[in-house]
């Protein structure tokens, strides 16, 4: 399919990365290639490592960026950054970008099952080679497990009712499509709650997607690994789309900026030194204009840290 993809906070992210024409940069979430293209435009002798776990994204972006010869495409998870760079004989890089969550091209590809607005098989896998999909979560998890996932990853106040309704419904037969699930959620969420706020299925779909793709698992460790492979003055820029991700990024940056574990009123004896300086004291948010032209950007937050 043709991937139309509007990169979120594009101008701001590129500015914060402080791109050097001869530098080595990593786009850990290639997606539709929007951020990668802007990085490549600014490189002369430099190089871009473009990573995505979704092979379709790699293929589409390779085509989009075919005029640039200084890009290396890697079909892998950005969490394996150390192994990826080692395999390329690269020791340090000058900047890293992550644009977390599901991308617009994945939402647009109906059969992937990411969207609650289009009927599709229960899938939601970012890596199509993974044997584990949304179908397994919805049809095989116990009521308690479903409630935990929906509450924890969707921050859904009706998690208990939704889990109960899913289990009750699947007694009649398998839940195979997204619209089947949407209907169950609508029945579970009281009418008064459905009348206001976002689509009633939004949080549950987010929760199942995070569970299927293990999006939050090891994110803090991945950020630490990325900071480790940054050169001094190199920057890491991370765009998040919900509070769970943002909290992990914020807290990991804070820990790296102030790793001291000594009691606050005592002189430091632990020997742990700051590793980064946080560049964005508050997250950078999209402009009103960007939200109007790209609704996906509404919940985006950008945080940036610089290696000391």
From Swiss-Prot:
Its main location: cytoplasm. It is found in: Cytoplasm. Its EC number is 2.1.1.199. SUPFAM superfamilies: Putative methyltransferase TM0872, insert domain, S-adenosyl-L-methionine-dependent methyltransferases. It is an enzyme of class 2 (transferase). Residues 289-308 are annotated as: Disordered. Specifically methylates the N4 position of cytidine in position 1402 (C1402) of 16S rRNA. This is Ribosomal RNA small subunit methyltransferase H. It comes from Thermoanaerobacter pseudethanolicus (strain ATCC 33223 / 39E).
């Amino acid at each position: 399919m043709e991937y139309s993809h509007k990169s979120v906070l594009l101008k701001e992210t590129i500015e914060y990365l402080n791109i050097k024409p001869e530098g080595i940069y990593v786009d850990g979430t290639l997606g539709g290639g929007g951020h990668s293209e802007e990085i490549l435009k600014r490189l002369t002798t430099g190089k871009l490592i473009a990573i995505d776990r979704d092979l379709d994204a790699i293929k589409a972006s390779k085509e989009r960026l075919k005029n640039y010869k200084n890009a290396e495409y890697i079909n892998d998870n950005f969490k394996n950054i150390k192994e990826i760079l080692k395999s390329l004989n690269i020791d340090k890089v000058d900047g890293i970008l992550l644009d977390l969550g599901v991308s617009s091209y994945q939402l647009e590809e109906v059969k992937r099952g990411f969207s609650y607005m289009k009927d599709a098989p229960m899938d939601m896998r970012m890596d199509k080679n993974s044997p584990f999909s949304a179908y397994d979560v919805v049809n095989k998890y116990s009521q308690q497990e479903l409630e935990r996932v929906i509450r924890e990853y969707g921050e859904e106040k009706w998690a208990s009712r939704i889990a109960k309704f899913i289990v009750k419904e699947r007694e009649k037969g398998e839940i195979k499509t997204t619209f089947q699930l949407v209907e169950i959620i609508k029945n579970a969420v009281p009418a008064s709650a459905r009348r206001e706020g976002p689509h009633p299925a939004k949080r549950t779909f987010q929760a199942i997607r995070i569970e299927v793709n293990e999006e939050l698992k090891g994110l803090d460790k991945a950020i630490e690994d990325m900071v480790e492979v940054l050169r001094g003055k190199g920057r890491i820029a991370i765009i998040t789309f919900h509070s769970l991700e943002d909290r992990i990024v914020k807290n990991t940056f804070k820990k790296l900026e102030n790793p001291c574990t000594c009691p606050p009123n005592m002189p430091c004896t632990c020997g742990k030194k700051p590793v980064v300086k946080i560049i964005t004291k508050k997250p950078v948010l999209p402009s009103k204009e960007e939200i109007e032209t790209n609704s996906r950007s509404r919940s985006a937050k950008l945080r940036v840290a610089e290696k000391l």
